Amino acid sequence: MAKVIGIDLGTTNSCLAISENGQTKVIENAEGARTTPSVIAYLDGGEILVGAPAKRQAVTNAKNTIYAAKRLIGHKFEDKEVQRDIESMPFEIIKANNGDAWVKAQGKELSPPQISAEVLRKMKEAAEAYLGEKVTEAVITVPAYFNDSQRQATKDAGRIAGLDVKRIINEPTAAALAFGMDKGDNKDRKVAVYDLGGGTFDISIIEIANLDGDKQFEVLATNGDTFLGGEDFDQRLIDHIIAEFKKEQGIDLKQDVMALQRLKEAAEKAKIELSSGQQTEINLPYITMDATGPKHLAMKITRAKFESLVEDLITRSIEPCKIALKDAGLSTGDIDDVILVGGQSRMPKVQEAVKAFFGKEPRKDVNPDEAVAVGAAIQGEVLSGGRSDVLLLDVTPLSLGIETMGGVMTKLIQKNTTIPTKASQVFSTAEDNQSAVTIHVLQGERERASANKSLGQFNLGDIAPAPRGMPQIEVTFDIDANGILHVSAKDKGTGKAANITIQGSSGLSEEEIERMVKDAEANAEEDKKLTELVASRNQAEALIHSVKKSLADYGDKLDAAEKEKIEAALKEAEEAVKGDDKAAIDAKTEALGAASQKLGEMVYAQAQAEAQAGESEQANASAKKDDDVVDADFEEVKDDKK
């Protein structure tokens, strides 16, 4: 059976896990780390860096280094949250032809799913390296409060990366899965999963029930904010530093892309340090310069100051907790365990706020960075048929419906309905002899249609002429286990039907996705070629170094013709290494190896002779030592004092 990997595709960091025979393991990436920064860098020559290597070069390549792409996924350029991010991001966010928010790097226009696919591809490669086999299937997690557009876009990202996404599951649900399966007891419990990640916040109330040895995870309610996370906490600190520096020096660092990137790194580091210490210092020499010369930034930040800067963000996370509890029909006293997930939940002030609201200490035995990937891996093993002791009942986070007369939204599926689910309702025409209707699909909680998220629209035509209110048009909403919506409309009189799978949403057409899949495959081939070229170059340079050293030591023992032949081969190999032709490098390396064979034999013979001489010298020294030994008689002396 094909293995299904679990991927937590995070805003700031991503994580990969696999579950086999009931045992889960977090898989390390190529750099040996258990989490991978969700950072992608596009270089001049077309090379793409992902993770730590991309993060390391961000300061010198700020405009082409993309982070937090997940905040843009499934969003329109005009969305107020996107407009807010444009002001703080050092890279360029643009409006795509379809109105979506895309990114421009190295002159190329890139969609968020395309960018996220690079992170997923790195995860896929790490899994293949660990398992020693090809991996094509995955379970990918998304914030519980992601809407249909964002879920579809995440699925598209997986497809571009060469992965068949078997299931999209909610991050808090995955974390609860990891927590519940780790507990050996059979106790039924209600848990609150507070998930404050890099870019999004979710709260889910989940009931874990034991059913004859199997565990059922039922999501009772979920709520959240897809634009609240660690990135916002970082930004508050960055804004504070910029304001203080402007007061002192009169220079606005917001206009300096390189300075902004350095500030981002420093703010993230300071934030982490303030989780364990009471004060930290930010030192950024040569942050900028003016007519008087270079300027240095040195500033002390206390934990109390940082907490005051982000107090309202922490308060903002508590409101969805209240709504989720109310929707679940529970009070804080009904919650058995509070689980913290997401890196930002490590902040002491966040933990204090959660404890104050729920009236109990959050659990510390769940790894906030890895739990989501572990849960996804467990679900992956369930889907591959590897285990059957887990049943997951998730919900749709937002209500779904259509626009009806008067510009109102009529809901067909209420929020927090367990999925998969299906609902139908009969509607009619608003005008006499109306021959077509437009089905406008919406997602959200507002009564006014325009205040909700538009997921797409389609037409049902050829309706038989009839007075208004007479034709019967049945609209059916069908949500699959991924939380992705399929809508159909049928004229009950004529039997004519039309349907739509809400895809617009990732903004990508089938043709665009296919092109991006091909681009990603081409990139993978390019990466492979680059790796092979670097390996050949390293091999050649190692041989060049070795031959040069041997020539310096033993060149005078070679005849002139032999030495000339080696020097010529050496020169050709050095020239080949400067180029990008792998075949030429390999050929010249082989030629140098053949030309320097006699020199190599000479070096080997000399090394053997030296080794034998060393052994002989050691034997003589040992014999001399034996000759110097004096035989002696020993007599035991008894101590009378004892």
Curated annotation (Swiss-Prot):
Protein name: Chaperone protein DnaK
Pfam families referenced in this protein's UniProt entry, alphabetically: HSP70
PANTHER family to which the protein is assigned, alphabetical: HEAT SHOCK PROTEIN 70KDA (PTHR19375)
Keyword ATP-binding recorded: yes
Biased composition (Acidic residues): 628-642
Remarks, miscellaneous: Present in outer membrane vesicle formulations which are used as vaccines in human.
Low complexity bias locations: 608-622
Listed NCBIfam families: PRK00290.1 (NF001413), PRK05183.1 (NF003520), prok_dnaK (TIGR02350)
Chain positions with Phosphothreonine modification: T200
Keyword Chaperone: yes
Biological role: Acts as a chaperone.
Taxonomic superkingdom: Bacteria
Coiled-coil boundaries: none
Gene: dnaK
Protein family membership: Belongs to the heat shock protein 70 family.
Sample GO molecular function, one term: unfolded protein binding
Cellular component per GO, a single term: external side of cell outer membrane
Gene Ontology process terms (BP): chaperone cofactor-dependent protein refolding; protein refolding
